[in-house]
From Swiss-Prot:
This is Chimallin. It is found in: Host cytoplasm. Belongs to the Phikzvirus chimallin family. Keywords: Host cytoplasm. Residues 1-29 have a biased composition (Low complexity). Coiled coil: none annotated. Self-assembles to form a proteinaceous shell that encloses the viral DNA and compartmentalizes proteins and DNA during viral infection. This micrometer-scale compartment contains narrow pores and is the site of viral replication, with the proteins involved in DNA replication localized inside. Provides a surface for docking of capsids during packaging. Probably protects the viral genome against host defenses. It comes from Pseudomonas phage 201phi2-1.
Length: 631
């Protein structure tokens, strides 16, 4: 059933008949005016209340036009997907109208229902429809600055629009429309369709989005119905087969379902390979690739401690390098041929991020690139904030691997931190929301316990032997909110996150005050978040140009190093043995490696890898389900 709430009719109904030919009739006689003095004065609750009292059919704002077009497009795409791609015709597409329900933006709702223990359960995935023709009121923040008060105006982003009130109204509407007023509504993760996406020209992307949205509903329904979880025991493969992790260093972004660019300097792909290197099917690789995780390496400046000598004859301790590498995870996904996205599959894919420590792959994006006039990743910019106080010419002909190694060793601490950008409105909204809850808040304990349960499902149990989540966090918030969006480098659409700390240092060209201004706009806790965001966007325009467009927000969180290392050891002991396909050691064999952990969240070693896949034993685990979400 595909229903338009503006007309309360389904798409399969016949088109209305044409209006009859115009006829001239005698004007009706005037009726005596009735007195209205005795009637109570109506109450108008905002614009919507006035429109309800004084009904007119036209809407000059045009806020409903994009939702109407989206419903038409998705209706056609559903027919195609059912006919051509074996998509089951057991879901509904509903139009949740902003004017009818008095919310910021309309959405299309992909809804699928089952009966669980006699109770109807409806999974919904709202596809939010930001609309450039609708000007939402800005959020105003008063900031006291000495004797004066500054007013900061902030744009409303899609995550703010999708509030608890929005979801509650959407849930009631879905229940009533599907005739299940007492049904339990579970969220399969909201996802915005970019305002600048031309719907009629993007049918391939939107058809994939429709199919993935139906699968997302299946994922959350399967979670509630007790589907047997994915386990690594099922990856033992056939004789002569192994799992390999391939590390690619890229300059081009990945893209999500609707074409948003995703920064992906490092991509670790897990795949099945034959030990002799031969494919079982020469031109068919659907069953080869399993998953991938994308990252980039940011550099964080650390406060420099003064070296101290407690006794006159004591040797002075060397000050640690001033920069810490942060490996930021930007994308976690299964191979296109895998329809399901379960929590266990997510943790399997994410665990491979730690493999970027093997051969110090996390540092490889900083290797000098020749022929690039304006290199945002030029590691030579670190020279501006060193004792040299000048850029190091990494493009020079005599700048070799040994010099690169010396530069890295002197300026960057050898053990990276692992971070992740979590987006409640993204492709992996369910897992991102779960981790944000675990990072702090009223659901922190439940969320952390749920994550541990999912990892136990993946490996067969016993993760608590490697990591005790009751005494330490899985991950922590940094207070850094990341603007998601894009910019154009010539004709190429790229991720706004290209502007990281090293890129800003390159752009500042030695102006240290300017760099610190940029850095403070990212995470200075002494500045109000709205003020930081305004300053950050000013730097975006200064460094990236006027083409910057914002599509949402993510929160950057830092993984506990003990959790990342424990996950690697746990999966290795459970039988997950992976070889590295194409890694190399930097600096002509020089070991770019630390001897101890520096800081609370820097990992202390490298991922475990194996020469062959030897896991043959199976594991059994009791799958657990919870109420409304993962809990």
């Amino acid at each position: 059933m595909i229903r338009d709430t503006a007309t309360n009719t389904t798409q399969t109904q016949a088109a209305p008949q044409q209006a009859p030919a115009q006829q001239f009739t005698q004007a009706p006689q005037e009726k005596p005016m009735q007195s209205t003095q005795s009637q109570p004065t109506p109450s108008y609750a905002g614009t919507g209340g006035i429109n309800s009292q004084f009904t007119r059919s036209g809407n000059v704002q045009g806020g409903d036009a994009r939702a109407s077009e989206a419903l038409t497009v998705f209706t056609r795409l559903k027919e195609q997907a059912v006919a051509q791609q074996d998509l089951a015709d057991d879901f509904s597409i509903l139009r949740f109208d902003r004017d009818q329900h008095q919310v910021g933006w309309s959405s299309l709702v992909i809804a699928k229902q089952i009966s669980l223990n006699g109770q109807p359960v409806i999974a919904v995935r709202p596809l939010i429809l930001p609309n450039n023709s609708i000007e939402l009121p800005k959020r105003k923040t008063n900031i006291v600055n000495g004797m004066q008060t500054d007013v900061i105006e902030s744009d409303i982003d899609v995550g703010t629009v999708f509030s608890a009130q929005y979801f509650n109204r959407l849930s009631t509407y879905v229940q009533n429309t599907l005739g299940k007023p007492g049904a339990k509504v579970v969220l399969a993760g909201p996802f915005p369709i970019p305002a600048d996406l031309v719907l009629k020209d993007s049918e391939l992307q939107l058809r994939n989005l429709l199919i993935k949205s139906v699968n997302a509903c299946d994922d959350i329904l399967a979670l509630h119905s007790g589907e047997r979880p994915f386990t690594i025991a099922g990856l033992k493969g056939q004789q002569g087969e192994t799992l390999a992790a391939k590390v690619d260093i890229r300059t081009q972004p990945l893209h999500d379902t609707v074409g948003n660019p995703i920064r992906a300097d490092i991509v670790v792909t897990t795949q099945r390979v034959r030990r002799n290197g031969q494919q079982e099917n020469e031109f068919y690789e659907t069953d080869v690739k399993l998953n991938q995780v994308a990252m980039f390496t940011n550099l964080e400046r650390t406060p420099q401690a003064q070296a101290q000598t407690l006794f006159p004859n004591q040797q002075q301790v060397a000050t640690p390098a001033p920069w810490v590498a942060s490996v930021v995870i930007t994308d976690v996904r299964n191979a296109d041929g895998i329809q399901a996205n379960t929590p266990e599959m997510y943790w399997f894919a994410l665990s491979n991020a730690f493999r970027s420590t093997h051969g110090h792959a996390w540092a490889r994006p900083f290797l000098p690139m020749t022929g690039v006039a304006k290199d945002m990743k030029d590691i030579g910019a670190l020279g501006w904030m060193s004792a040299l106080r000048n850029r190091i010419d990494t493009k020079a002909a005599n700048f070799d691997d040994a010099q690169f190694g010396q530069l890295m060793l002197s300026q960057v601490q050898p053990n990276p931190v692992f971070q992740i950008d979590l987006n409640r409105m993204g492709e992996t909204a369910q897992m991102d929301s779960l981790q944000l809850d675990a990072a702090g808040g009223p659901n922190a304990q439940k969320a952390a316990a749920t994550i541990i349960r999912q990892i136990n499902n993946l490996g067969g149990g016993g993760f608590e032997r490697f990591f005790d989540h009751t005494t330490q966090p899985i991950l922590e918030r940094t207070g850094q909110v990341i603007d998601l969006g894009n910019w154009f480098d010539g004709d190429e659409k790229r991720d706004r996150r290209d502007l990281d700390n090293l890129a800003a240092l390159n752009a500042a060209e030695g102006n240290e005050n300017e760099f610190w201004g940029f850095y403070g706009a990212q995470l200075n806790p002494n500045l109000h978040p709205d003020l930081r965001n305004r300053q950050s966007r000013n730097y975006d325009r200064q460094y990236l140009g006027s083409t910057v467009t914002y599509t949402g927000k993510a929160e950057r969180c830092t993984y506990n190093a003990k959790f990342i290392e424990a996950l690697d050891r746990y999966l290795a002991e459970a039988g997950l043995q992976i070889t590295m396909d194409n890694t190399s050691v930097l600096n002509s064999g020089q070991r770019f490696m630390g001897n101890s952990v520096i800081g609370n969240n820097m990992v202390s070693g490298q991922a475990q890898v194996h020469s062959a896949y030897a896991g043959t034993q199976g594991f059994n685990t009791q799958y657990q389900t919870g109420p409304s979400s993962f809990y």
